[in-house]
Amino acid sequence: MTWPNRDQPAFPSSSSGAFSALPQGVSHGGVNLSSFSDFLRHQAPHLLPGAPGPGPTGLPTDAVPHGTTIVALKCPGGVVMAGDRRATQGNMIASRDVQKVYITDDYTVTGIAGTAAIAVEFARLYAVELEHYEKLEGVALTFPGKVNRLATMVRGNLGAALQGFVALPLLAGYDLDDPNPEAAGRIVSFDAAGGWNFEEEGYQSVGSGSIFAKSSMKKLYSQVTDAESALRVAVEALYDAADDDSATGGPDLVRGIFPTAVVIGADGAHEVPEAKISSLCREVVENRSRTETFGPDARPTRGDEL
């Protein structure tokens, strides 16, 4: 990392007592020491996601990769988040194996959609933000505090969003302060201006395929009884989104590329093994590819069978 003034140290020396004399949570020189992004904004703003840099302005938004689609579902005792792997650049497929779901701390996961470069930096910086706060304050942020921190970061990207480079996260986590462990799963969506909303319906999706994914989850959410069934509904929703949205990638059985997913519960956040996702995706594809319901030899369906 390069600081604006190399002749001055980025941090005061410990011998000066500049930091040690400060109580926890107090700002220093107008900078909130417990917020890494706030510190970065004052010391090296060009390193923040979406910060203007050298080069031509007015770059077409389809000239950079975009990622979609993310889904999240609450289940008894936790929450599940999953994302497809495709990134598009205009009408081209820029990548087929993008990672869009990131574990940001022990009980929080972030899914990203929109301008890929900015969205990935959001997820990484947010993970550092949470770790930085815990180290300085000695305690982890509450879940509402995590929401506010991420909302502030999203709001800081408003200038780039107004130019078309929108990056929207989807936050999911387990609220340790909820007295009812079975209902401690949380899903929070954001808009480009930093506004946020706790999802009470139990599911949410962001990205270009979100309208199709949400329609699928709306029909299947009643089947969610645990993390396993929630994971299956998430895969079904991503499959439906890929079926109608060209920017969303479905399970790629030929290349062995499948969605990624994270399950969060009282024991923390855990990535779902690829073998498990692969098996579930193959089962979904097989169930939707039965010869008696698809293809030129399919038996016509009578009206009374609908």
UniProtKB/Swiss-Prot annotation:
It is found in: Cytoplasm. It catalyses: Cleavage of peptide bonds with very broad specificity. Residues 1-67 form a propeptide. One of its GO terms (molecular function) is threonine-type endopeptidase activity. GO terms for cellular component: cytoplasm; proteasome core complex, beta-subunit complex. It is an enzyme of class 3 (hydrolase). It comes from the Bacteria. Pfam families: Proteasome. The keyword Zinc-finger does not apply. GO terms for biological process: modification-dependent protein catabolic process; proteasomal protein catabolic process. Pathway: Protein degradation; proteasomal Pup-dependent pathway. The formation of the proteasomal ATPase ARC-20S proteasome complex, likely via the docking of the C-termini of ARC into the intersubunit pockets in the alpha-rings, may trigger opening of the gate for substrate entry. Interconversion between the open-gate and close-gate conformations leads to a dynamic regulation of the 20S proteasome proteolysis activity. Gene3D superfamilies: Glutamine Phosphoribosylpyrophosphate, subunit 1, domain 1 (3.60.20.10). The active site is at T68. Its EC number is 3.4.25.1. InterPro entries: Ntn_hydrolases_N (IPR029055), Proteasome_sua/b (IPR001353), Proteasome_suB-type (IPR023333), PSB_actinobac (IPR022483). Keywords: Autocatalytic cleavage, Cytoplasm, Hydrolase, Protease, Proteasome, Threonine protease, Zymogen. Its main location: cytoplasm. Belongs to the peptidase T1B family. PANTHER family: ATP-DEPENDENT PROTEASE SUBUNIT HSLV, METALLOPROTEASE TLDD. HAMAP family: Proteasome_B_B (MF_02113_B). Component of the proteasome core, a large protease complex with broad specificity involved in protein degradation. The 20S proteasome core is composed of 14 alpha and 14 beta subunits that assemble into four stacked heptameric rings, resulting in a barrel-shaped structure. The two inner rings, each composed of seven catalytic beta subunits, are sandwiched by two outer rings, each composed of seven alpha subunits. The catalytic chamber with the active sites is on the inside of the barrel. Has a gated structure, the ends of the cylinder being occluded by the N-termini of the alpha-subunits. Is capped by the proteasome-associated ATPase, ARC. NCBIfam families: 20S_bact_beta. This is Proteasome subunit beta.
